[in-house]
Amino acid sequence: MAKIVKVIGREIIDSRGNPTVEAEVHLEGGFVGLAAAPSGASTGSREALELRDGDKSRFLGKGVLKAVSAVNNEIAQAILGKDGSAQTEIDQIMIDLDGTDNKSKFGANAILAVSLATAKAAAASKGLPLYAYIAELNGTPGVYSMPLPMMNIINGGEHADNNVDIQEFMIQPVGASTLKEALRIGAEVFHNLAKVLKSKGLNTAVGDEGGFAPNLASNADALACIKEAVEKAGYVLGKDVTLAMDCASSEFYNKENGLYEMKGEGKSFTSQEFTHYLEGLCNEYPIKSIEDGQDESDWEGFAYQTKVLGGKIQLVGDDLFVTNTKILKEGIEKGIANSILIKFNQIGSLTETLAAIKMAKDAGYTAVISHRSGETEDATIADLAVGTAAGQIKTGSMSRSDRVAKYNQLIRIEEALAAAGTPAPFNGLKEVKGQA
């Protein structure tokens, strides 16, 4: 048993130039874990609270000194002397100490940073790579898989300053046999997409997640540009590369009139009409996964969408489920969607994140591990994806070091597992009903 001997919180800067919380947890023997909390732009209303200072004289009110103070004081005092490998106990101590349903006293950003730093320190004390330690915490020691990347190569919505309503247009290199090959395919398509956009006189500046953010006449135009890029890269769309979208529908849903208002192309849809709009895109392009295809509160709309599309493609709940087992349980019981997006800052601790992944898998749902639009160099989600054998990961495009850091960690993990004679299987999309 290695006891926690020091806990340090600090304010650092994320990929959008906003502050976030970093935590250091020190154990006996000199073992140290360092972790930082990510931050979202389009957020579900039922996410755990990200505590900001609100002091307009610092960082336009987005400082996190209150959360950092909680780490350095109340949280540190509560967990000093505890066994660093008692992850569930430590997380529960912080949850109970906070005492709110949404971690609004200390902030999910404070609790999560300490939770992850504790896991990293404990892994180091046991001489284990983080993914192996996570697998132990998950109750699945030695069970790993390399995740299929869902690469966000055209950004819209809240992730870009353009007129594209749908937030993410992604590619999935399903023809790859390894993670490293998948990244090569993704990079080649990404660079060819830059050429396609330039040839059309379109902007090749990138958005928050490293994808291009051009102004386009329609969402279908984004898919057409990607199709051209895939072909120019020498790949076959639908065989080597498939497509995915994150609609982030809550961002353009008008609660007053119940319509999905896509201002970028001047169209409005009822709930069912929007499902059929997406169905039309799926008929035209090999789209294998759609995230948040309805507003988070439109459960009737989600039920209809699941009925229409759920047997054909992956329907991922992000704002819908917010990595929360209570909400996911209700969704499973009602047959809503067939997959959950996993963002550990939505719930605020590693223990609760693992519980959500387990609940999803036990119900036959897939779990997609995800970054946030505000990230740091922290690559914990790479280890989380491998250690839970989740099978899929969303961590942005092939640019911006805050995104590429996760891909590079996956390369290292794949290499290490192969060198140990235990190569991990690849491509979790095959688990989805209706997929090849």
Swiss-Prot record:
Does the keyword Secreted feature in the UniProt annotation? yes
As for family, the record states: Belongs to the enolase family.
* Described function: Catalyzes the reversible conversion of 2-phosphoglycerate (2-PG) into phosphoenolpyruvate (PEP). It is essential for the degradation of carbohydrates via glycolysis.
What does the cofactor field's note say?
Binds a second Mg(2+) ion via substrate during catalysis.
Q: Name one GO biological process term.
A: glycolytic process
Q: Which domain of life is it from?
A: Bacteria
Give any GO molecular function from the UniProt entry.
magnesium ion binding
Q: Which gene encodes it?
A: eno
According to its record, what are the GO cellular component terms? cell surface; extracellular region; phosphopyruvate hydratase complex
Cofactors required = Mg(2+)
- Amino-acid positions noted as binding Mg(2+) in the UniProt annotation, renumbered to this chain: D246, E291, D318
Give the species this sequence originates from: Actinobacillus pleuropneumoniae serotype 3 (strain JL03)
The places in or outside the cell where this protein is found are: Cytoplasm; Secreted; Cell surface
Phylogenetic placement of the source organism: Bacteria, Pseudomonadati, Pseudomonadota, Gammaproteobacteria, Pasteurellales
Keywords, ordered alphabetically: Cytoplasm, Glycolysis, Lyase, Magnesium, Metal-binding, Secreted
Q: How does it assemble?
A: Component of the RNA degradosome, a multiprotein complex involved in RNA processing and mRNA degradation.
Q: In which pathway does it act?
A: Carbohydrate degradation; glycolysis; pyruvate from D-glyceraldehyde 3-phosphate: step 4/5
As recorded in UniProt, its EC number(s) are: 4.2.1.11
Which reaction equations make up its catalytic activity? Answer: (2R)-2-phosphoglycerate = phosphoenolpyruvate + H2O
SMART domains (UniProt xref): Enolase_C, Enolase_N
- The catalytic residues are E209 (proton donor), K343 (proton acceptor)
The protein in question is named Enolase
Q: Does the keyword Secreted apply?
A: yes
InterPro entries in the record, alphabetically?
A: Enolase, Enolase-like_C_sf, Enolase-like_N, Enolase_C, Enolase_CS, Enolase_N
